[in-house]
Amino acid sequence: MQSTVQWLENVAFEAKSESGHTVVMDGSPAYGGENRGARPMELILMGLGGCASFDIVTILKKSRQDITDVICQLQAERAESIPAVFTKIHLHFVVKGHGIKEKQVAKAVELSAEKYCSASKMLTDGGVEITHDFELIELSV
């Protein structure tokens, strides 16, 4: 996997992925940014949510659950000192659909956290405490 990050101006950068997608990153105005894009640490948090959500959707589809939406809400805490690394992250999954079995969702969340999510594994190996929970929303037919 490869990526290129190019400086645009001030503290703004454009990242290009190997698959051809671009993302603009920018610092906060307090550091000379203009709020033109997500902060780099926000992208790490979003990447974790995307990685875990990918697992949840894939696992639930394989277990034939009739899901219509999966939302991952993340809350993170960072160290007070430099480097201001993540210390705690909580992932809350909101799973919507028809006749979804709670046991299947619990299993999907557990498998993502303990086996499949590369981003989660990398962060927990680095000392980040990651917790998970979920809620089911049954949609009427």
Please describe what each predicted stretch is.
Residues 1-46, 57-141:
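Extended beta-strand/beta-hairpin segments
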